[in-house]
Each structure stands twice: as C-alpha cells, then as structure tokens.
Amino acid sequence: MTGVMKVKSSVFNILRIVRYKVINETVVIVFLSKFTKHIKQMNHRWTVLRNSWSLTKRHILFVTKYSDLKDIQKELLNSVEFVVFIGDFTKSIFFSDYKMDNIVCKDEMQDFRQHFKTKYKLSYMGHIFVIPHKQPTYDLLTEWLVCNIYSLQEITNINTIYFEPPHVVVFDMDSTLITDEDQVRIRDPAIYEALDALKKYNCVLCLWSYGDKEHVVNSLNKVKLDGYFKIILSGGRKAGEYQLNEEEDRYYNVYYESTPFYLNMTDVKNIPKSPRVVLWYLINHNIVLFKTLTLVDDLFDNNIYYDNFVNLSTCPVPVNDWDKWHTQIVRFIVNYDKKFKNY
C-alpha cells in the first residue's frame, strides 16, 4: 500500500473584536478569500535541484527548505531525481551531486506541471513525495496524490501494465455521457466510436459520477457503456472522510467505490473531482505513471488541477454534438505528444 498523505482541511473560527465591536465574520472571510486568491495567482520562484545520477528517474521530493534533506539517508535521497522548494539555495557541503535551476510559476499543480515538463523536456513526471514529519504547505500539493518518501522503493517496484505512460481521461456521467432524463439515454451515439478511438491514442478511460452506485451501474448498463472504462468511481460529492466501500464487478474488472480521502476544498459550493482520488486508484491498478490528466465534465466547479479540462454543455435530452468535444480531447493529446515526441 502506498504511503498516501491525508491532509485534513483546516477549520477556522474567525472572530475579530475592534474597539469592543465584532467585525462581521462574513466580511473577514470574503477578505481572506480574495487575499488568498491573489496569493495563489502570484508567480513563485521555485528552486529545483536535479541529481542526474539518481537511481530512479522523474520522481520529485517537495521540501520546505533545503536543510530538510538532512533528515533523509543519502541512499534514499539518491533515488530521487528532483528536489523542489520555494526559497534560496544555500550551497552546502553535504550534497554535491545536484545541479540547480529555477522555475517561475504559480503555486498550482497544473501550472507547475506544465512549466516543469517544458523546462526538463519530460513527457511525463514521476510521483510527488514529501517527508512525512516535515510536509510543506504549498497549495499545489492539496488535492494531489502526495506520497511518503519512505514508500518510494515500494512504488518503484510496482509492475506497470503500460510500456509507454498513457494519457488519462476522466469522464463525468450525468449530462455528459448520458441525458438527465428519468429514463436515461446516450448523449450521442458517436460516443461509442469516440471512446474506442481514444484507447488507440494510448488513453486510460475512467468514469467518475457523483451518483450512487446503483444509479451508475444501472445507467451504464442501460446505455451499454459498461465495458469501456478501466476505473469507475461513484460518490464523493460531500467533503470529509469517506469509508472505502468497494464492490468488484468481476465481469468488467472495475470497482464501484466511495472516495476514502479528506478533501481540502470545503469552501466551495460544489466539491471538485480531486485528482488525488483518481491518481490513488490508478496506482492501485498498476498504472504508475501517466502523461496527462483530462477531465470531461459539464460542471465547471468539478475541475481542479487537471492538465486539461473539457467543459461541455449539458444534455437534458440527446444532442448530436460529441464530435465537437471529442475533437477537443484528441487535439490536446495529439499536440502534447507532438511537443514531447522525443522525450
């Protein structure tokens, strides 16, 4: 089992008293929300240390400061190619294997992944690791699969089922692939052929519906989409910790599960579909590395940190428009593979 760091959401009880008067709590929250949003949009100067002689490639260790590396044995550290943190690098005596670079980007995973892969000409990245007792508080680590550095060897030893890391495409179900009617229908018959085509582009297809398991199973069976997806997830709309309640469909080799994670996003109306959940199930299906992560969903709020987001229109009833959305998915994948063709 991989060492997955559970990051609990912080709950702040804000009470401000100025000259014996209580400031309206809502005003304080709105101010802090705007201030936090402004901070997130700022670019940061990330220090990247690269060990070209590392035993395993592409994995990244995030630390708060360079001196945190003293807590890790040299043998383990030699298995990490990249060490990343915000701040200056004080040249030290104890590690001379690193080459230092800088990346300027937002404290946000999508932006970081784009800049990082472009900088180092990598078509895919390894896993994200932290030191458990010194975990950084960077925003980009929230809602992402963050692993314990001491589980690195275990993760490295997983036998992946893909020779070349795939692209991962996560589909919503209701009002995306099927209609919102009581008697659900397929959105567009072109969907079947389009899903088959994506597999030829080396894509792993996943489905994540906020509906309950019975609704998901019955709907997929009715519109004959039950054999297309490697991973099927149900539930996860509410914030908090979910019990891992899984049921295996042995015929189709998929799972219908609730998300066993604390979700960090508690201050929004709709809880987004956290990549952390998707990545956790991928690694448990021996899909260890991937190139890109795409979300296809009719709800804008469901997107957070995905490399690509296809925000399609709703479909209360069938509509013949899938070619438009399929083209957006394929164009992103083709352009990406062309950009990183030799990497």
Swiss-Prot record:
InterPro entries: DUF705 (IPR007827), HAD-like_sf (IPR036412), HAD_SF_ppase_IIIC (IPR010033). It comes from the Viruses. Signal peptide: none annotated. This is Uncharacterized 41.0 kDa protein in P143-LEF5 intergenic region.
